[in-house]
Amino acid sequence: MVNRFSDSEIEALISEFGINTDVERVSLKADAELYRIKGKEYCCFIIDSPEAMQIACRPSLVGDEMEKLSGALAAKAVPAILEAGAIKNPIIFEHILRASLGYHLHDSLINERKIFQAWIRTQYTYPSYKDHNEPEKTIVSTFEDFSALDSCPQGAADLVVQDTIASGKTLEFSLGRIISEAEKRGIVIWNLVLYGFISERGLDYIWNGIKKRGIEIHAFAISNLTPLCSNNYDMPLYGPDESLYSEKGIIKNIGGAISRQAFERYAGLFIPGLDQPGDFSARLSKLYNGKYFEDSEIPVHLKRSYDYIERIAKMLKKERPSLYSKTSGR
């Protein structure tokens, strides 16, 4: 069931949740829609397509169907990224395991350019699902393979990373490792290309660190540049911050960046407050751990998503009954 909002209701949502629609369409030959977000020191784009909207709005999309749509989206994204001029040098592609392969950008990019694939798996020293706040949660590397850098030409290189970027802490750690390994081999990273579900706060955090190294950023966010909930994990398009409400009973409205036209489409399908990527790795068919493929945890993701949606529904029904009536039954 898709409920449609009137123009006045769309404007009210944009205003109430602080949704940033100050974006400009980039004219491309590629199939994907590309929008540039204004007012950033770095190049920040939104990549949108029917596949992107399905992945963002349907947490029940998992397994082979999820992989198929993700691959189709990546096949549209690569021409857009290249046409936007984001890649000019030899390409180092860093996979942050285990979710990386599920974005499938490398599968399409490798058909267009030679890439040197590096691998790293990180983990928090304490369980981190829906909780990236605790200062004692440090990140460590449990697997690394940078051997492909031995074949990469010395000099300037572009670094491509596909991942879910929430707080940016995991990415920060992974970037530090590969930049260090590249420098040992006479390789200088000039440009960082990011692709995936990306939060604005996490991206700003990465930029504030990476610009000190003189590295440029071209970020390509799937569907929208998201806000980040108070747990530094959930990445909705818009809605109340569910984690803050559950913890402290406080209603805080948050919204991301998206084109006005795209928001009209998404508003009819999206559950306000829903974490768009979910536990992205758990939505995939198989997970590569650096040595072999292992089963994902699809049932765990589905149960968590169901419970999450139930909490959102109860919150909206109590605090925002008019919005609940528009979005219930999805």
Where are these regions (language model features)?
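PRPP-associated nucleotide enzymes
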Residues: M1-R330
